[in-house]
């Protein structure tokens, strides 16, 4: 609200005075330089002359009225917060009659100072602020407003800080505003200049930490991922995860490794579990198989492509071998289709028969030759020759896992000129070179199952189609693979130690972020709880503490109020149990 200068008679001073009533919100006022108060003095002289006329009606000429020189007094507004310019010399004024009896006075000049403009309407002079203000050192106001026409924004202040609000509320009474043009402080990782693998905040100064964050700062915030890259053995920076980026945990080989991610504590904690997928090797019809049989019932999901332990492999190899049986050729009792499996490590004895001598030899290449010769030292007649031969029998070697398949299990006699067939069963190779028959295990054996070790719980490897199954010999129980070396290349088996290391690293990073956040909250609680001085002219040192979910924060603060109660300063320093520190400082003016 704009006021004007008014000229009134001050009976206490016995003089005319000029009183300024400019708007009290202006902290610096323009001065009014008054050289001569014409109007007020003329009015006084007229009134005085009228009074004299009543007493001396016959007088045509009035004597000069001698008055004390009027002194110009410039007052502050009623709040007492205005500023008074120094009054120039010779600013007093007077009204008098000249020698011709004419009232004479100096002129009054009202000037508008800095940032003010003046408008005259008759005898009224109205002061107002200019549209554009310059060279202001401070402005004290309860509310500062910008713009108009529905876009007006008000800025106010309270104990919590500055408040921004639209003059006209939007949908659902929303008065919030957007602050645009805020500069970004953090490293810009949004530029299309290649992948960012690592970001540190070493370049952020303490002063920059007190800045307001922009949306770009929020999008540039994140955390670093470090680990062993494919084809390397040393830990290195892998990637920088920004806000809203997606971190996906996947298995490099779903046939051997499982990855499960679970959110807990209402999203405050995420567990990543990495496990090994195992298979079981089983024996079926003399062959090693793994995985679930096509006709097998039950809940087994073993596809035969999982991991197996060394013991399971050994047990499976011990079940490997070649199968043999006797035939009905030359009148001998055969074993039909029932084969005996000669497993790895089984001793096979070729014994001399009646009238024959068995010779077993091994060449430099490791080939074993079994040769039967007639014992010519015995005198034989024709009948003996015709009935001579050798008995063929099949027995399991004592102490071995070999067995004789049921069927033609009784000894069979091979007579002269009768053919004895030695057939190559599964995984057996027979090479006949003249009279020599070489029997060897195939270098590429195929087994339906391989048991490693003895007993019902011995690990067994078995094949089901294209699947490898690993389990106990009897009930196909899950078994462990031990003494597995750490994987180095892609496709290598990962051991439990590596899996625990990955999980522990992830948990440590997540726990570290959570701990820092909780410590920061405790630090903020301690700072917010600091008390401050509230009486003019008083100062206060305060210390406070705070805790939040196992973390602690502490703060110390200093506050002071000026003697007039207008100025308030406050500073705080704080820290937390994570070894991080912060500080704040503020100054305020209240009226």
Swiss-Prot record:
Pfam families: ESPR, Hia_Tpr_ring_dom, TAA-Trp-ring, YadA_anchor, YadA_stalk. GO terms for biological process: cell adhesion; protein transport; symbiont-mediated perturbation of host phagocytosis. It comes from the Bacteria. Residues 504-591 are annotated as: Translocator domain. It is found in: Cell surface; Cell outer membrane. Residues 1-51 form the signal peptide. The keyword Hydrolase does not apply. The chain crosses the membrane at residues 537-547, 551-561, 570-576, 580-591. Keywords: Cell adhesion, Cell outer membrane, Membrane, Protein transport, Signal, Transmembrane, Transmembrane beta strand, Transport, Virulence. SUPFAM superfamilies: Pili subunits (SSF54523), Trimeric adhesin (SSF101999). Its main location: other. The signal peptide, cleaved at the inner membrane, guides the autotransporter protein to the periplasmic space. Then, insertion of the C-terminal translocator domain in the outer membrane forms a hydrophilic pore for the translocation of the passenger domain to the bacterial cell surface. Involved in adhesion of capsulated meningococci to host epithelial cells. Interacts with laminin and heparan sulfate, promoting the adherence to the extracellular matrix (ECM) components. Belongs to the autotransporter-2 (AT-2) (TC 1.B.40) family. This is Autotransporter adhesin NhhA. The gene is nhhA.
